[in-house]
Amino acid sequence: MLESVKANFTESIQTMIASLEELPEPIALATQMMVNALINGNKILSCGNGGSAAHAQSFASQMLNRYERERPSLPAIALSTDTSTMTSIANDYSYDEVFSKQVRALGQTGDILLAISPNGASRSVISAMEAALSRDMTIVALTGLDGGEMAGLLGPNDVEIRVPSSRAVRIHEVHLLVIHNLCEGVDDCLFPETSQE
């Protein structure tokens, strides 16, 4: 048991170190894209399934409420929170459309879709990306493995933050850290703290 726990910590640390080597640039780019969108009066929609839905909701709540400092609310919507909408879409159409129909209704040109899937193959998230592209939105994709089908949908104005791991649990761990970096970066750019001297 103890060896298993230690092995999990070791693997997690190794994945974080590998991510440190590969992810700062796409994270910084995604942060700047979000800042620009918010300055221009746009919003950020976020989606994912399972643990990724929790990450999408965490991101939106930290935009709407706050991350670590007091500041005005920022416009963000997690598409996985309205169970009535999601279940009616899944029942009447298909689960694949639970996010895409919301993107078509809520998304506007200049908005950002934060699309989260550890393997880049979640059909409902891919459909949301396709809907976002049809609405002339920009996409920030949080993926892992080889990026899956999601990576193939991205254009030159989009950004992929791909965790260098093949294990979903490790990818989820890094995705949460990425989301915290995005939130902190947005706050730093829009609401810089002034030093008290």
Curated annotation (Swiss-Prot):
Top-level taxon of the source organism: Bacteria
Pathway: Carbohydrate biosynthesis; D-glycero-D-manno-heptose 7-phosphate biosynthesis; D-glycero-alpha-D-manno-heptose 7-phosphate and D-glycero-beta-D-manno-heptose 7-phosphate from sedoheptulose 7-phosphate: step 1/1
Listed GO biological process terms: carbohydrate metabolic process; D-glycero-D-manno-heptose 7-phosphate biosynthetic process
One GO term describing the cellular component: cytoplasm
A Pfam family that the UniProt record links to this protein: SIS_2
Localization per Swiss-Prot or TrEMBL: Cytoplasm
Enzyme class: isomerase
EC number(s) stated in the UniProt entry for this protein: 5.3.1.28
Residues that coordinate or bind Zn(2+): 62, 172, 180
Alphabetized GO MF terms: carbohydrate derivative binding; D-sedoheptulose 7-phosphate isomerase activity; zinc ion binding
Major localization class: cytoplasm
UniProt KW keywords: Carbohydrate metabolism, Cytoplasm, Isomerase, Metal-binding, Zinc
Entry's cofactor comment: Binds 1 zinc ion per subunit.
Annotated residues for binding of substrate: 49-51, 62, 91-92, 122, 172
Cofactor(s) this protein cannot do without: Zn(2+)
Transmembrane segments: none
Reactions that this protein is recorded to catalyse: 2 D-sedoheptulose 7-phosphate = D-glycero-alpha-D-manno-heptose 7-phosphate + D-glycero-beta-D-manno-heptose 7-phosphate
Domain SIS: 34-192
Cross-referenced CDD domains: SIS_GmhA (cd05006)
Note: The reaction produces a racemic mixture of D-glycero-alpha-D-manno-heptose 7-phosphate and D-glycero-beta-D-manno-heptose 7-phosphate.
Role description: Catalyzes the isomerization of sedoheptulose 7-phosphate in D-glycero-D-manno-heptose 7-phosphate.
Similarity comment: Belongs to the SIS family. GmhA subfamily.
Record's subunit section: Homotetramer.
Name of this protein: Phosphoheptose isomerase
